[in-house]
Amino acid sequence: MPHNSMLKENRLFKPTDEFRRQANISGLETYQALWEFADKDYLTYWSDLARELITWKKPFMHIFDDSEAPFYKWFSDGTLNVSYNCLDRHLPDKADKTALIFESDFGQVQLYTYAKLHNRVCRFANALRELGIKKGDRVIIYLPMLVEAVIAMQACARIGAVHSVVFGGFSASALRDRIEDAEAKLVITANAGLRGGKIIPLKETVDEALEMGCKTIENVIVFHRVNIDTPWKKGRDLWWNELTANQPAFCEPEWMNAEDPLFILYTSGSTGKPKGIVHSTGGYLLGALNSFRNVFDNKPNDIFWCTADVGWITGHSYVCYGPLANGATQVIFEGVPTYPDPGRIWRMIQRHKINVFYTSPTLIRSLTRLGDHIPNKYDLSSLRLLGSVGEPINPSAWMWFYEVVGKSRCPIVDTWWQTETGSIMLAPIPGVTATKPGSCTLPLPGIMAEVLDENGQKCAVEQGGALAIKRPFPSMLRTIWNDPERYKSTYFPAEYGGKYYIAGDNAHRDKDGYFWILGRTDDVLNVSGHRLGTMEIESALVASPKVAEAAVVGKPDEIKGEAIVAFVVLNDFRPEGEEARQLAEELKAWVSNEIGKIARPEDIRFADNLPKTRSGKIMRRLLRSIAKNEMITQDISTLENPQIIGQLQQQWL
């Protein structure tokens, strides 16, 4: 069956004998024993792993504390340092091992050994301390995909500062919101970034954000990436290289309590205000470390490449922390996968002899459209394992990845997890689990996942329901920054008894117990693996002086997974024809400027008003059907203004 016509694929794909023979976990009996042990003696399972995998300054005695549930604590009397676990402990036997292979936008390659990376992290950490940054202070990192982003994150972890990385594609107002919520003291940025041959003026965006408020910011550290004129505020702005030039090459780690915050990462919420997800030091590190080792079957000589930006959780767990804590070698790429030509990504795999390749369904789908002949021109024989992250992967893209890229010999680990979970929750163990295209298969040992109906009962086979995790796990978020009540109501809702972690995704299980993710239950869109709140986009549209009202929904998109459709009511008229097309383009650019290009609507439609019930509630379900060009089958008897349906169906592309 050709890849492009496949809607469902029912075959099971078992790991090859060759892969299974060398896998870290290979026997079904071994895997089942591990799973049963985790199920029966849950706390011993996690405490054994924590003692085996993490280097502790002060070993923990207390494994788990649920006395303030759902604010759970793990290993709470132990002390450690994440940077020490990622760098220092490898120096006795891995000082000269390559930690990072950096490839720039224009193809220049730089290697960083563990010793060199340790040196750079320590120098930068000492510079931060010299500026008065101390344990618990919040630091915003707004950098391109450079080694310096990892250095900045590790340096914060080393001195106990709480970093909050903001994706470099976010706008000044989005950056300001995050700075103000975190009450950060410092911003770390670059004068500009390079992507696809284009210069991205990051420092200008930082300046614009700080002009809007952000009174807590004392300094801005600027890495010189591009030779351009850089706007400068004397007394506040400092050059990275000047700060670090004379710093000592060792920085004593700050020994942190396991429950101290490691970082805040903002993720979109359905109410419009981004949620500051707080991750702990000990539990988060254990999750990233253990999942990297098992899901990616980590080997001492592997070259690993995760294409995620560090502005997202995948870049935290499987670029900055998981690989380095395991002493692995990985690639960091500054540029765009199809620049300067469509073969870039495959040429990099050939050039660096990459063994494990972890990327998003959006990228896979965009590469399939370019044709099989492009990857077939390159030697991809170094690959032994492929991975997918960020959204469900459709079976046709899975099969293309498996057959064309992996030559039907590389297992695919389709992983489900979230910013909030910190590490992978559901995924195949590649030497054991038979895979099904489109399914993230089974929970990892120690993760007790289930699909629940609206009464909190286990769903029947193939019945859709809410994906839940029934027991706390070490890498889960600890709270929402400055909003503990929102944490409780969002993740431990009363309708499920307040005791289960409710992921906000719908799923079902098949007859083999495999999980299939069906999509978001709330008003959060998943665009190219990035979560965007509908309320945030609606707020941006309404901020335009021309817009009176807006409603945003998603529709399926074969490249992005989900595309943004906006229904807009203007202040005084409804445009048609060329005028509507021009206004739609203007509003798309407006949203890009307000939030970032990732939030640019694919389709904007104009109406005299929005479909509302007589109580004034917008009928979003109806809008979703219209966006998908579906026949309207739902009950519209409560619709106050049925005459506008025809207007809402008109596209001005």
Swiss-Prot record:
One of its GO terms (biological process) is acetyl-CoA biosynthetic process from acetate. Its cofactor is Mg(2+). The modification N6-acetyllysine is found at residue 617. ATP binds at residues 390-392, 414-419, 505, 520, 531. CoA binds at residues 195-198, 314, 528. It is an enzyme of class 6 (ligase). The keyword Transport does not apply. One of its GO terms (cellular component) is membrane. It holds the Pfam family AMP-binding. It catalyses: acetate + ATP + CoA = acetyl-CoA + AMP + diphosphate. One of its GO terms (molecular function) is ATP binding. Its EC number is 6.2.1.1. Mg(2+) binds at residues 542, 547. The keyword Ligase applies. Acetylated. Deacetylation by the SIR2-homolog deacetylase activates the enzyme. Belongs to the ATP-dependent AMP-binding enzyme family. Catalyzes the conversion of acetate into acetyl-CoA (AcCoA), an essential intermediate at the junction of anabolic and catabolic pathways. AcsA undergoes a two-step reaction. In the first half reaction, AcsA combines acetate with ATP to form acetyl-adenylate (AcAMP) intermediate. In the second half reaction, it can then transfer the acetyl group from AcAMP to the sulfhydryl group of CoA, forming the product AcCoA. This is Acetyl-coenzyme A synthetase.
